[in-house]
Curated annotation (Swiss-Prot):
The active site is at H64, N137. This is one of two catalases in S.cerevisiae; the other is catalase A, which is the peroxisomal form. Present with 319 molecules/cell in log phase SD medium. Its main location: cytoplasm. It comes from the Eukaryota. GO terms for cellular component: cytoplasm; mitochondrion; peroxisome. This is Catalase T. Its cofactor is heme. Its EC number is 1.11.1.6. The gene is CTT1. InterPro entries: Catalase, Catalase_AS, Catalase_clade1/3, Catalase_core, Catalase_haem_BS, Catalase_immune_responsive, Catalase_sf. It is found in: Cytoplasm. The lineage of its organism: Eukaryota, Fungi, Dikarya, Ascomycota, Saccharomycotina. It comes from Saccharomyces cerevisiae (strain ATCC 204508 / S288c) (Baker's yeast).
Length: 562
């Protein structure tokens, strides 16, 4: 499948300069003033190569730096038209090409891909209506629920600011942060089981974690969470095996997927949503906007809607995997809205912003990020996935900047009334095209529009959240935060899995340098299960001094929700 419309060239390949003209000398020969003399400034072939080499690296991702990926195909097997008017979810049998990138979260690009860490699983679907992204993880929950904590949390997962050692040598700051922010306990309980070390990228699941809101043509809201489940089932490595591979084969997962696809295998995933009405959300035991909680499947069963098939390796890692840019803003296409999840709201800004820093202001014009319906002349080729198959040409008023590949040619950069410059606007449900924003907007038209928006907002907020003013708020910790991870440890993990969980925690926490933090780790797990805390204390060689949640919060100055 040729996503980018690239023609298969059969012409001879000639070594050339960047301007396209052939270079007649040996590529390895520099130009000297005389044999064994100094090189000449006029050797522009040498200068061009050195200058290019000096600029080869772009900043690596601040998170999810280590990764790999491939091309894919999405197919809609079951319509979601009853809960959303989003175009890709309407017609059974709809297919589109795409790209997926798998990654770890905390490590740099050279770290092992079998490390105990969540896995990022990000999808980009090249639909006829534009690019649609899913930016997921392989865990259904996360370490935090307030966006303000995300930068400092990531700092704690990186290298120590003084020693510059990472958590393979020193885990003090890692556990210091987690135990002072115990809403992390659900993610930690998940991650320090063998679920934290998947056997391969093709045999692990992916979850949105966040709640999104799907809207149907009647304007009815439905909360959803996405699940992408491996067709072969979830397979894991033991902690010891993952650690061994970290040393012997740090690119294990990347190599395994590349080999699978090279050998003709096509791993498959099944796509589901959980759905929750706003009325159900009011009765739900937890907040629908809490990223540290799951929706129980008994109450909110999975509903299948599609499949994803991994189809082939990319042609060039840097061009298609390193330069690909995902964002949850691309999840929120017409028919899908973001929820009030604080972390999701912040990601809507952070993801595009970090790509502008990493790749440049025009990163969405790069071939791997360019929408099919952009109408860019450089997208044309013999592919079935070019702009000609799209229902409309995408146009906006964003112009210029560094490395602008496609600047919309003669299209005006404002709403114009000039001949042959007609610009149409689609309604929210994508059914109608009109000139509704042409000309002068009267006050009464604005007032009607604002009143309708306010009514919709008040209606939705009344159902789930009371209408609130702005205020500063610290999420407290409460017994509710331990219910789901306790059930995971006590009811889902069998005896052998519990032993492995203790082993994994102790092997990691034994690298803590500060005795106070090491002691707090035992109390942290003691809040989950007292016997668990006691066993970990014995294994770490620290006194077991159990405390209840209130005592823990007071001792370590943690905000309590009580």
């Amino acid at each position: 499948m040729n996503v980018f419309g690239k023609k298969e060239e059969k012409q001879e390949k000639v070594y050339s300069l960047q301007n396209g003209f052939p270079y007649s000398h040996h590529p390895y020969a520099s130009q000297y003033s005389r044999p064994d003399g100094p090189i000449l400034l006029q050797d522009f072939h040498l200068l061009e190569n050195i200058a290019s080499f000096d600029r080869e690296r772009v900043p690596e991702r601040v998170v999810h730096a280590k990764g790999g990926g491939c091309r894919l195909e999405f197919e809609l097997t079951d319509s979601l038209s009853d809960i959303t008017y989003a175009a890709p979810y309407q017609n059974v049998g709809y297919k589109c090409p795409g790209l997926v990138r798998f990654s770890t979260v905390g490590g740099e690009s050279g770290t092992p891909d079998t490390a105990r860490d969540p896995r990022g699983v990000s999808f980009k679907f090249y639909t006829e209506w534009g690019n649609h992204d899913w930016v997921f993880n392989n865990t259904p929950v996360f370490f935090l629920r307030d966006a303000i904590k995300f930068p400092v949390f990531i700092h704690s997962q990186k290298r120590d600011p003084q020693s510059h050692l990472n958590q393979f040598q020193d885990t003090t700051i890692y556990w210091d942060y987690l135990t002072l922010n115990p809403e992390s306990i659900h993610q930690i309980t998940y991650m320090f089981g063998d679920r934290g070390t998947p056997a391969s990228w093709a045999s692990m699941n992916a979850y949105s974690g966040h709640s999104f809101i799907m809207v149907n043509k009647e304007g009815k809201d439905t909360y959803v969470q996405f699940h992408v489940l491996s067709d072969t089932g979830f397979e894991t490595l033991t902690g010891d095996k993952a650690a061994e591979l970290s040393g012997s084969h740090p690119d294990y997962n990347q190599a395994k997927l590349f080999t699978q696809l090279q050998n003709g295998e096509k791993p498959k995933f099944n796509c589901y949503v959980q759905t929750m009405t706003p009325e159900q959300a009011t009765k739900f035991r937890y907040s629908v906007n809490d990223l540290t909680k799951i929706w129980p499947h008994k109450e909110f069963p999975l509903r299948k809607f599609g499949t994803i098939t991994l189809t082939e390796n990319v042609d060039n890692y840097f061009q298609e995997i390193e330069q690909v840019a995902f964002s949850p803003t691309n999840t929120c296409i017409p028919g899908i809205k973001p929820s009030n999840d604080s972390v999701l709201q912040a990601r809507l800004f952070s993801y595009p912003d970090t790509q502008r820093h990493r790749l440049g202001a025009n990163y969405q014009q790069l071939p791997v990020n360019r929408p099919r319906n952009l109408g860019c002349p450089y997208s044309k080729g013999d592919s079935q996935y070019t702009a000609e198959q799209c229902p409309f040409k995408a146009v906006n008023f964003q112009r210029d900047g560094p490395m602008s590949y496609y600047n919309f040619g003669p299209e005006p950069n404002y709403i114009s009334s000039l001949p042959n410059q007609t610009l149409k606007f689609k309604n929210e449900d994508n059914d109608e095209v009109s000139d509704k924003f042409k000309g002068i907007v009267l006050d009464e038209v604005t007032e009607v529009s604002v009143r309708k928006q306010e009514q919709d907002q008040i209606r939705n907020e009344h159902i789930v959240d009371a209408k609130i003013n702005q205020y500063y708020y610290v999420y407290g910790i409460s017994p509710l935060d331990f219910e789901q991870p306790r059930a995971l440890y006590e009811k889902v993990y069998n005896d052998e899995q519990k032993k492995l969980f203790v082993h994994n925690v102790v092997c990691h926490a034994c690298k803590i340098k500060d005795p106070k933090v090491k002691k707090r780790v035992t109390q942290y797990f003691g809040l989950l299960n007292e016997d668990l805390g006691k066993v970990i204390a014995e294994c770490l060689g620290v006194p077991w001094e159990p405390v209840d949640l209130e005592g823990y919060a007071k001792t370590w100055s943690i905000a309590s929700a009580n």
